[in-house]
């Protein structure tokens, strides 16, 4: 789903869902959170999708979940869906150079190694990999040294409008868990240098998600840094999961013909969240 399609979809949301603009990109596209607020005093489960441009089927999944009313019976906590964390990147990946000013197009081609094919692009329109730009051991692992299609951590922590807006909003919403959807591999990541007590708590939750989805838990702690999940674990000290959607046999970008099978494996999400909420509350 591209940015224009997203805006159109959001006009037809159920009345229980609110659309909030939490920030804007370099090229003035809206960073949008869709909220289901049960009670302002409650904590929140936050979902993040399309932080990597070529992984925009994750936006389709979130909206499919909302449209299928998977969350309608939740009454203990609020829900927030950051439905497209990287709208500039998604527009570039899906629509190409024409979606950007002429003055910027030459820079984009240069960042893309001279190619005008942006189908594999992950970064934002400044060539920063947003999922390497958060304040969690930032810049400590192998990464690109210059703006590019993927892997460039930025010039400093939170150098990008997107990561700044998302971090500010996340703290404001008092989350008890965050779920980041990526592609691909049908894997779950949850650990990032937690203390033993939090590690036990977070592993319980990860195992529940693994059981319901059939995904495999992987330990990528030593190879991860600067990610949204990493930041939530390290700085907010809450459970945070990354779910890699879609079989590893699929090719990037994953086409929408695979959406129904991805949805089927993730349709127990409301029950998983309720379990996570109970585990979190008991650990406090």
Task: Locate predicted features.
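A residue-level signal for conserved active-site and pocket-lining positions in enzyme catalytic cores
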Residues: 28, 130, 243
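Short alpha-beta junction capping motif
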Residues: 46-48, 53-54
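Metallocarboxypeptidase
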Residues: 140-284
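Conserved beta-strand elements of the Class I
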Residues: 44-46, 241
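…and closely analogous acidic/polar surface helices at protein-protein or active-site interfaces
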Residues: 61-72
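Active-site/substrate-binding loop(s) of hydrolase catalytic cores
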Residues: 42, 56-57, 71-194, 198, ...
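Short beta-strand-to-loop junctions in surface cap/lid or active-site-entrance loops
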Residues: 32-42, 50
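Short glycine- and acidic-rich boundary segments immediately preceding or forming the N-terminal edge
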Residues: 1-34
């Amino acid at each position: 789903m591209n940015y224009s399609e997203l805006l159109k979809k959001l006009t037809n949301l159920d009345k229980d869902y609110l659309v909030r603009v939490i920030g804007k990109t370099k090229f003035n596209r809206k960073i949008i959170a869709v909220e289901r607020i049960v009670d302002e005093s409650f904590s929140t489960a936050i979902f993040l999708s399309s932080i990597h441009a070529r992984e925009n089927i994750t936006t389709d999944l979130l909206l499919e979940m909302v449209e299928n009313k998977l969350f309608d019976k939740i009454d203990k906590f609020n829900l927030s869906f950051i439905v497209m964390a990287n709208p500039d990147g998604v527009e570039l990946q899906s629509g190409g150079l024409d979606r950007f000013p002429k003055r910027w197009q030459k820079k984009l081609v240069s960042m893309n190694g001279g190619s005008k094919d942006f189908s594999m692009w992950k970064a934002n329109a400044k060539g920063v990999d947003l999922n390497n730009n958060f304040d969690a051991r930032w810049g400590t692992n192998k990464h690109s040294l210059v703006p590019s299609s993927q892997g460039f951590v930025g010039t400093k922590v939170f150098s990008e409008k997107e990561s700044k807006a998302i971090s500010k909003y996340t703290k404001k919403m008092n989350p008890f868990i965050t779920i980041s959807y990526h592609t691909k591999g049908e894997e779950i990541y949850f650990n990032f240098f937690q203390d033993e007590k939090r590690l036990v708590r977070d592993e319980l939750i990860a195992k529940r998600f693994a059981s319901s989805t059939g995904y495999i838990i992987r330990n990528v702690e030593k190879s991860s840094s600067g990610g949204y999940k990493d930041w939530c674990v390290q700085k907010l000290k809450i459970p945070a999961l990354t779910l890699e959607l879609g079989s590893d046999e699929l090719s990037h970008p994953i086409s929408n013909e695979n959406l129904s099978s991805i949805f089927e494996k993730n349709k127990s999400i409301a029950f998983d969240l309720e379990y996570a909420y109970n585990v979190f509350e008991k650990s406090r």
